[in-house]
Amino acid sequence: MGNDISKMRNIGISAHIDSGKTTLSERILFYCDRIHALHEVRGKDGVGATMDNMELEKERGITIQSASTQVKWKDYTVNVIDTPGHVDFTIEVERSLRVLDGAILVLCSVGGVQSQSITVDRQLKRYHVPRIAFVNKCDRTGANPFKVRMQLREKLGLNAYMMQIPIGLEDKLEGVVDLVTMKAMYFEGENGTQIRMAEIPQHLLADAQKYREEMIDAATMFSDELAEAFLEGAETEEMIRAAVRKGTLAEQFVPVFLGSAYKNKGIQPLLDAVGYYLPDPTEIENTALDLDENEKPVVLGTDENAPVVALGFKLEDGKYGQLTYVRVYQGTLKKGEELFNTRAKKKFKVGRLVRMNSATMEDINEGGPGDIVALFGIDCASGDTFCGENLNYAMSSMYVPDPVISLSLTPKDKQAADQMSKALNRFTKEDPTFRSYVDKESNQTIIQGMGELHLEVYIERMKREYKCDVETGMPQVAYREAITQRADFNYTHKKQTGGSGQFGRVAGFIEPCTEQDYEFDNQIKGGAIPSEFIPSCDKGFKEAIKRGTLIGFPIVGTKVTINDGQSHPVDSSDMAFQAAAIGAFREAYKAAKPAILEPIMKVSIEGPQEFQGNIFGLINQRRGIIISSTEDDNFTRVDAEVPLSEMFGFSTILRSSTQGKAEYSMEFAKYGKAPASISEELIKEYEAKRLAEKK
């Protein structure tokens, strides 16, 4: 391969919106010699930053889709994955985090740790991504990197230590003092490309000494050698770096760097830090799930000769067709080789293999462990795993939660209708939690997803990317129906229409079952129903549970047992027994006391402690049950279970009740029985709708 894997870094730049993330990516590309002119995100020259290559991102100066770019810095190869900063795009962020080995957490030296920094940090913790922090915008009025360091400790609970201190702040920012080498660094020349090393200015010496001792003292936790040397005043730069690296990889130490990407100060030492302190692909344990062994976890190696395991983490519609970004975990992915998509259970051939540098690409022949490459023209979905010979692994669980909310879409005109189907086709491939279908009865297009916000993002993207104007209906909750007791049936289906008629009788009972949505048990003895018609009965029952009679939603948790029946030598047929089963089920269903089930969501709300009372109030007003509430450092986190139907418009209400300082996340937990008052209302609405349709 020629690439030394220990010199390879896969990093993401994670941040709150507007903390200067894209500008930092741009500078990294510049100093690593990837682009020859610098562009600002909202530049005067009308050329947006290189990493933001989706039109909408350029226009709004935010980053939505993660582009990946490979750069060389000294003897390191660095893949920079630009992650979205908006909370609404968290599926993108989480996907990017799967493929990162380390991250740079960017913070604004004025704004500090903001609500979204908390979300991003929580995701980094969940995926165990070691990080270094960069306090950006130190040239701005009100800049205070020391305050930001304290917030990293207090709000995020990170063991953060300064690796540098600033030489001047705001418009007097000249450079930084490196606390490892105890030298001052000034960034000079056009675009700050020349670094001048000098002695530390006299007035900063005491501060430098203080912060250096703090940092080394913390690093001695990870190195006995450093602890001994420090006591004797004999510590070396190598010892300090080795200890800080060890702490960072264990996620127990966060080195803090600072500068101003816009003013080209502090970027080169940050790039050095990526090499010094962030992990190479061999230092991170990646696990796959063995689908042949009931999703048993398997630890992947980084052997280039092992069978290939790779993850397609990002799809893009380019001018040359679908582009799939892939992270190789083990083995070598070669052009022309055959791979197996474990979700689609399909083999495919690797045609063109490229390496992306933001929007330009170079053709390559192979990619080894730790590499990030892109494939052309492969039909796959985001999150698919590609394996080499005889492996059936998935990088993430095949479990995709069922959507809990749906919305009808009506295109404004014929052109919008064409664009809408293109957009939906692409979005459903990109995001496994987003689905769409056409409702047979109303002939409307329905989209489904994990929450209100989730669907809003896609409607917005349709307008922008596909110039497609749609009208949206009211959000609909995915209810279910279920029986609550056993009921018997004995039903005869008889139809005489000249020629051969239809005849079939089925008898048995239905009862609730908790293990699965539907179970069929055949207890027929002595051929009361001929064996060739048993599957017809099963088919009929399956058809019957698709729509309940209370409010027309699917029926879950039902076991059907048949134990008797009757057939006719001429008039019995597949269709006759299907019809008999449907009739039998409907007859028993009314007697089995059916109930309506509603989706219950697990809601987590985080916000300042002073709003805890308001948060409890909001949950109680929504028929919610508080499961736990924890406090740490002026912050409160409340976990609750709340019916989805009560959560519409919640983000706006939460913002106004907490001065915009709280945020929430929500995921599907379970189905629960709807209270009688709610059920009665739903049944009334359904009956009124049916009456209106008949007219």
From Swiss-Prot:
Gene source species = Treponema denticola (strain ATCC 35405 / DSM 14222 / CIP 103919 / JCM 8153 / KCTC 15104)
Question: Which named protein is this?
Answer: Elongation factor G 2
* One example GO MF annotation: translation elongation factor activity
Residues recorded as binding GTP, renumbered to this chain, are 15-22, 82-86, 136-139
- Which Pfam families does the protein's record reference? EFG_C (PF00679), EFG_III (PF14492), EFG_IV (PF03764), GTP_EFTU (PF00009), GTP_EFTU_D2 (PF03144)
| Residue ranges of every copy of the tr-type G domain listed in the record | 6-282
Family (UniProt): Belongs to the TRAFAC class translation factor GTPase superfamily. Classic translation factor GTPase family. EF-G/EF-2 subfamily.
Cross-referenced SUPFAM superfamilies: EF-G C-terminal domain-like (SSF54980), P-loop containing nucleoside triphosphate hydrolases (SSF52540), Ribosomal protein S5 domain 2-like (SSF54211), Translation proteins (SSF50447)
Alphabetical UniProt keywords: Cytoplasm, Elongation factor, GTP-binding, Nucleotide-binding, Protein biosynthesis
Which cellular compartments is it found in?
Answer: Cytoplasm
Could you tell me which SMART domains the record lists for this protein?
A: EFG_C, EFG_IV
